[in-house]
């Protein structure tokens, strides 16, 4: 089986794209099938190579790999062949209305309470009328086979049916000779043997038309799944909505697996759960769990998931990334992973555990810190050093609770709050602990 993800390279990947790509990928991998990446770049004015590169980079970052890829712009000759075949068969016809004339017709139909379906007037033009339009380049429509009930079994929505009388003949080629989405898409699906098409519910009416096109070309009909659209604050998500691109999510410090864990489950009957490997998402994937109801997207939910993903990642998962902080110790990661919201927070903890941290010692605490220095147990700092140290200190001071712990934390970390010092001390090490506690002496 083969699925495909077909973004238009007219902008960056937004969250709606990510969800579709991920679901297509998971479906293919679950079935041991293939995942095809197709760039719908027939809009030559808006499509850009830089967006193709960025989309590829974003998918790689998200751990979504593809088995093959191509651009529709490389297949125009093939589209022309099929176009000419359908034209010869009388299934495509030229039209000459301007945009203004089409808009006028649409408004008049709506005013009369009629559906704004194209009236097929171009099919009834006399030769004399066609001659009048000789200076106008035509655009072309596909001729829908009317009086037909178009049905398919959607894996998300169940049985879906359209009466072809309620469908307007779609424009498939523009005045400038470029193609719209409709025809190239089904030619590619046919030629590349795409067996399963998963996309947003905004394509449902397109599916009805494309099924007729596939019948006209005597091609197999793929299995369709139409996902509910993502909404955020009651607005449909699109690439034009700010703050919802992969680039934005990267800037928030989100982990790829936090994003994948979230989008693999929202809009399904299953709760969102933490996964650090794509194989876990593959094992739990089931297209039939997706709901038809609108799916609410909330970036705050992904942000809350991010620390849980980090906490679940092993040292081997992050070993290479830690090298940029000169960290090679598994014990450091095992301690820090439960105390960070995003990976870049590592920098702060690396400074705390290195010699770059400047202690914070108040004037009223200098004598107490010197006492604490003298009470520090001898030898290597271990997991039990903190408890032994505090026990020694308490025997020589009346300080208790925060009056005892806060000055020590400030001197050792520069912070008034944080994780257990008992676990942190071995990472700092005896030499550095002594340096920090001695800081008041050199002021």
From Swiss-Prot:
Motif window: 'HIGH' region: 7-17
Broad EC category: ligase
NCBIfam families reported for this sequence: gltX_bact (TIGR00464)
UniProt GO molecular function: ATP binding; glutamate-tRNA ligase activity; tRNA binding
Acetylation in keyword set: no
Ligand binding (ATP): 239
Protein family membership: Belongs to the class-I aminoacyl-tRNA synthetase family. Glutamate--tRNA ligase type 1 subfamily.
Catalytic activity: tRNA(Glu) + L-glutamate + ATP = L-glutamyl-tRNA(Glu) + AMP + diphosphate
Biological role stated in the UniProt entry: Catalyzes the attachment of glutamate to tRNA(Glu) in a two-step reaction: glutamate is first activated by ATP to form Glu-AMP and then transferred to the acceptor end of tRNA(Glu).
Organism whose genome encodes this protein: Ehrlichia chaffeensis (strain ATCC CRL-10679 / Arkansas)
Enzyme Commission number, as recorded: 6.1.1.17
Quaternary assembly: Monomer.
Motif ('KMSKS' region): 236-240
Domain of life: Bacteria
Keywords: Aminoacyl-tRNA synthetase, ATP-binding, Cytoplasm, Ligase, Nucleotide-binding, Protein biosynthesis
SUPFAM superfamilies the record matches: An anticodon-binding domain of class I aminoacyl-tRNA synthetases (SSF48163), Nucleotidylyl transferase (SSF52374)
Major site of localization recorded for this protein: cytoplasm
Protein location: Cytoplasm
GO cellular component: a single term: cytoplasm
Protein name in UniProt: Glutamate--tRNA ligase 1
Source organism phylogeny: Bacteria, Pseudomonadati, Pseudomonadota, Alphaproteobacteria, Rickettsiales
GO biological process, one term: glutamyl-tRNA aminoacylation
